[in-house]
A protein has these predicted regions:
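Interdomain "pre-motor" coupling segment immediately N-terminal to P-loop NTPase/helicase cores
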Residues: 84-142
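Noncatalytic partner-interaction/assembly domains of nucleic-acid and motor enzyme complexes
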Residues: 1-99
Length: 142
């Protein structure tokens, strides 16, 4: 995958959860809402997790009830509902996670550049900051 995100893969995973809510348990072992690139997909996934935690059905009506129309346009939910569910969901989930980690690494690269030129920070402080951020990424992706 050349890119650090795929809207179609995100849509397919959300569609699979909608059509087979039992899949959410496996997905939750790998993904967090922040792993989704599209803000609307993050929000929809958050709502799915909340519904699951509240022992409520994960379906279109309950999702719409909990979504704020300012956050997610109905057309996005319709695109998810019209997407074909996938059979090997975990392979798609791993692609989303991989892209998420790469985006975090790209952000860290920007942070490294800023920290490296920060005059008020010693080299050891800069290293500690960078190592801390890298550690967060590595433990979150495991």
């Amino acid at each position: 995958m050349d890119s650090v995100y795929s809207i179609n893969i995100e849509r397919a995973v959300l569609s699979s959860i909608l059509f087979n809510p039992e899949e959410l348990e496996d997905v939750l072992g790998v993904l967090k809402p922040k792993d989704f690139y599209l803000p609307a997909h993050k929000k929809i996934f958050e709502v799915m997790v909340k519904l699951h935690n509240d022992d409520m059905p994960i379906d279109e009506e309950f999702i719409k009830k909990r979504l704020d129309s300012k956050d997610v346009d109905d057309s996005i939910l319709l695109e998810i509902l019209s997407a074909n569910p996938i059979t090997n969901t975990l392979a798609y989930v791993r692609e989303i996670k991989d892209g998420s980690v790469k985006r975090e690494l790209a952000t860290l690269a920007t942070t490294i550049k800023k920290v490296a030129i920060e005059e008020e920070m010693s080299a050891n402080e800069a290293l500690d900051t960078i190592q801390g951020e890298l550690y967060k990424i590595s433990t979150d992706s495991a």
